[in-house]
Amino acid sequence: MIVLAGLGNPGSQYAGNRHNIGFMALDAIHRRHSFSPWSKKFKAEIADGTLAGEKVLLIKPQTFMNLSGESVGEALRFYKLGPEQLVAIYDELDLLPGKARIKLGGGHGGHNGIKSLDAHCGLNYRRLRLGIGHPGDKSRVQAHVLGDFGKLDAEWLDPLLETLAENADMLVRGEDSQLMNKLALATGTKADEEKPKPAKSHIHQARNGVQPKKLPETGPMAEMLKKMFGPKKD
């Protein structure tokens, strides 16, 4: 069995956020292939099916981003799987929009969802990073990742997600180079770009920045942001 874990924040108000591209990727795979309807288990939305002759579990943690590992780790333990059977799909600030990279293991790059997966699942899993671009100024990072994709983003976002879904069997078989070439052709990016420089964590990048407009003041998301960024200074 292979577990494909898309990372994001739950709730319709966050569905279009750049931070939720992992959820979007799993939704595209779910639409394209014959998976079961979404159901709730492991503090997540899950669906099961078969790709490339392999049983596949799609999982979208509903714990909010920085607790994603609790959900995914529970699923791995239930099915007696190791990190080698896990593929995480998530947003990457330090890749150009539409650019994709995949690797086995590595650091979290400041991504809070990946920090949580590392803590609960181990390090030796495959990581598919989907570029959302950097806003260019650390003070705008929080607003960028928690902001919605714009209409112009559809020019690369739709081909990226549809091509990933169409070739999800390559992801399951571990044909990573072939998949990266497919995605690069679909989005007009290069499959052999230089590796991005290590990024500071989202927390450090955004702590001294301007808070984005219309952030929730109550509820689970508000509590998560308070823990991440602390009280606003005068």
UniProtKB/Swiss-Prot annotation:
What this chain does, per the entry, is described as: Hydrolyzes ribosome-free peptidyl-tRNAs (with 1 or more amino acids incorporated), which drop off the ribosome during protein synthesis, or as a result of ribosome stalling.
Query: What organism does the record attribute this protein to?
Result: Allorhizobium ampelinum (strain ATCC BAA-846 / DSM 112012 / S4) (Agrobacterium vitis (strain S4))
Record HAMAP family: Pept_tRNA_hydro_bact
Q: What is its EC number?
A: 3.1.1.29
A molecular function annotated in GO for this UniProt entry is:
tRNA binding
Name a single GO biological process: protein quality control for misfolded or incompletely synthesized proteins
Q: Main localisation, per the record?
A: cytoplasm
List of catalytic residues = H19
Keyword annotations of the record:
Cytoplasm, Hydrolase, RNA-binding, tRNA-binding
As for family, the record states:
Belongs to the PTH family.
The positions annotated for binding tRNA are Y14, F64, N66, N112
Return the annotated region ranges for Disordered: 187-234
Q: How does it assemble?
A: Monomer.
Q: Where is this site: Discriminates between blocked and unblocked aminoacyl-tRNA?
A: N9
Q: Which reaction does it catalyse?
A: an N-acyl-L-alpha-aminoacyl-tRNA + H2O = an N-acyl-L-amino acid + a tRNA + H(+)
What is this protein called in UniProt? Peptidyl-tRNA hydrolase
> Which PROSITE patterns did the record assign?
PEPT_TRNA_HYDROL_1, PEPT_TRNA_HYDROL_2
Q: GO CC annotations?
A: cytoplasm
